[in-house]
Structures are given as structure tokens and as C-alpha cells.
Amino acid sequence: MCGGAVISDYIAPEKIARSSGKSSWRSNGVFDCSIYDFDGNFDELESDEPFVFSSTHKHHASGSASDGKKKQSSRYKGIRRRPWGRWAAEIRDPIKGVRVWLGTFNTAEEAARAYDLEAKRIRGAKAKLNFPNESSGKRKAKAKTVQQVEENHEADLDVAVVSSAPSSSCLDFLWEENNPDTLLIDTQWLEDIIMGDANKKHEPNDSEEANNVDASLLSEELLAFENQTEYFSQMPFTEGNCDSSTSLSSLFDGGNDMGLWS
């Protein structure tokens, strides 16, 4: 330093002054202060050259900036910043034993997400990610979306099945549309016949009663006819060389005209 010479010069006179002072004090009993030239010593310490602290200040500033960049680059795994400002992402593949280049990105977050995707592909669930919460949230949202899509698909299938089932009115409309000339037939008479047959089974049959009446009348007529034949068989003209049966047969046959009423 520039003041080193002054200090060295200042120390030597002090020792000399002490030794001389002691001797003068001892000899004369009075201390001589003339040997202490304080103003002169301070004048020698003053210097016109200013102290320069800018170099050390610049050194600390550059160090803090580099520390900030290092902290920012080390905040995420598998990324580093290029000198021109872009961010590079890469990951080590343990199977191949090489570092896989993932590309350069505009922001550190984009590079970190690219690293996360490749890490999940290589290491699976054991991968250490930069955004673990974000990936789990995405998986939950994806699972929920898939479940919602499946439920909507099942609902659409149910609606399609219900809507595809044709109703009777639709069938009638289609039949009428395809067959415009078809006449509408009233089937009420068929229902009346069916209902009438069912009622007749429970009611008494008039035809059977009529048949019974006819049979009784026929039996009465036959009985009367037999009585008449017996009457004719007892008449005197039937007596002769022919028996009664022959005379009766000849009477009905009309072969021999007999003047019964003459």
C-alpha cells in the first residue's frame, strides 16, 4: 500500500522518541514534546489517489447473477439454459445407457414438462417428476372424463334401443303408407259372432227343442196311421181268397180300381 512506507517511517521515530524521552525525562525531569510532529505525520498519510471499489462490486454482481441462473436452471430436473436464452431438455435412458435429447424450448416449464413425459415413459410410476401434482391431477381428470364418456355412451345406446322399437301406431301408419288402397274392414261383426257363440253355449238350444217337438208329432202321426191301417184291415171287402196284407198292398198300390164309394 501507499501508506506502508509512512507507517514504517512512523514506527521507527516512535521507538526513538520513547527511548529519547525516557532518557530526557530521566536526565532533565522535563518531557520534550518537540520531537512529536503530529501534523507532519498526518500530512504524509493523506493521498490524492482515490480507492477503487468498483472492481470488487462488479465481481459480486456477476457472482449473484450467475448464482440466480444456476438456481433457476437447477429448479427443474433434466433441463439447462443455452447461452442464447432457450432451454434444453434431456434425460438419461438407463436401458440404452445414453442421454436422450428432448429438444429446446422457450421456457423452463415447457422443458420440464417434456422431461416429465419422457421420464414417465422410461421409468413409469417410479419416475421423479418436476410436476408430480399436475400429472396426478391430469390422470384423475382423464379418468373422470373417460367414465363420463362411457356413461353418456350407455345412455345413448338405451335411447337408441327405445327409439328403434316400433310401436303399433307406427306399424299401422307404415302399413297404410305402403298400402294406400287397402280398405278398412270393420271387425266388429266378428267379435259379435264370437260373443254370440259364447252366449249360446250357456243358453238352451231352440233347435233341439224343435227337434224334440217334431219327433213327438211324428210319433203321433205314425200312431194314427197304424190305427187307420188296422181299421182298413177289419173291413169285410178284405175277406176272400186274398189275405189282408195283399188286399192292403193292392189298395195302396192302386193296381185294382175298386169302387168303394159307388
Swiss-Prot record:
Transmembrane segments: none annotated. The modification Cysteine sulfinic acid (-SO2H) is found at C2. Keywords: Activator, DNA-binding, Ethylene signaling pathway, Nucleus, Oxidation, Stress response, Transcription, Transcription regulation. One of its GO terms (cellular component) is nucleus. Disulfide bonds: none annotated. GO terms for biological process: cellular response to anoxia; cellular response to ethylene stimulus; cellular response to hypoxia; ethylene-activated signaling pathway; positive regulation of DNA-templated transcription; regulation of DNA-templated transcription; response to anoxia; response to ethylene. Its main location: nucleus. The keyword NADP does not apply. It is found in: Nucleus. GO terms for molecular function: DNA-binding transcription factor activity; sequence-specific DNA binding; transcription cis-regulatory region binding. Expressed in roots and at lower levels in shoots. Gene3D superfamilies: AP2/ERF domain (3.30.730.10). In presence of oxygen, the N-terminal cysteine residue (Cys-2) of ERF73 can be oxidized by cysteine oxidases, thus preparing the protein for N-end rule pathway-mediated proteasomal degradation. Under low oxygen levels, Cys oxidation is prevented, ERF73 is stabilized and confers tolerance to hypoxia. Induction: Induced under hypoxic conditions in roots. Induced during hypoxia under nitrate nutrition. Induced by ethylene. Induced by hydrogen peroxide. Residues 56-79 are annotated as: Disordered. Residues 75-132 bind DNA. Seedlings silencing ERF73 exhibit reduced elongation of the primary root. Seedlings overexpressing ERF73 exhibit increased elongation of the primary root. Plants overexpressing ERF73 exhibit increased tolerance to hypoxia treatment. Transcriptional activator involved in the hypoxic stress response. Acts as a transcriptional activator via the cis-acting element GCC box. Plays a role in low oxygen signaling and contributes to tolerance to anoxia stress by enhancing anaerobic gene expression and ethanolic fermentation. Invovlved in the modulation of ethylene responses under both normoxia and hypoxia. Belongs to the AP2/ERF transcription factor family. ERF subfamily. This is Ethylene-responsive transcription factor ERF073. The lineage of its organism: Eukaryota, Viridiplantae, Streptophyta, Embryophyta, Tracheophyta.
